Amino acid sequence: LFGRNFDWQNCEAMIVESHPEEGYASLSTVNMDFITQNVGVGMMSAALNSDEIKTLAALYAPLDGMNEAGLAVSVNMIQDNAAIEQDTDRPDITTTTAIRLLLDKAGSVDEALELLGQYDLHGSMGMMVHFAIADSTGRSVAVEYVDNDMIVIETPVLTNFYLAAGEKQGIGTAQSHERYDMLMHRLEATPR
């Protein structure tokens, strides 16, 4: 079971179906406002008014999705002024391109974690985020970046606050804590 809400107010959303030649087919959700935001005027603005160009760009801007192997991934924002800007000798990747990489190439949580560990992550649009990743075996983790270190937490639920132990734990909105508590209560009360 993997669920995610898409509660952006007044946004244009797109469901993207992908069938890469070398990788897993997937469905993903894209907030199209992220693609067209801050484009301005001129050639780029005119190009992004084309449905074909927006659809092509959407392929590389997923916020969540599931692939044919049963891997599901979602990005959740955390209300924090910190940003993810890893800086090692690994190749750079942004939040949304990381999701596309995982959907295309990872068939399990372990494979997803191995892939993420090969890159320096940079938060798209400077936002602090964490990932919910689950697979067909029922394994479910949160991947958080605290002080630019990747931390993996085994958890069946993720909302919009840090789960990792340490000084950041719990930072996020009160509403995200309420949703987390409600979901955990429901899960614990549901027979398996």
Regions found by a protein language model. Give the residues of each.
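Short, well-structured alpha-helical segments that form the helix of a local strand-helix-strand
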Residues: V109-D120, R192
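C-terminal, well-structured catalytic/ligand-binding subdomain of enzymes
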Residues: L1-L59, D64-G65, A69, S74-D104, ...
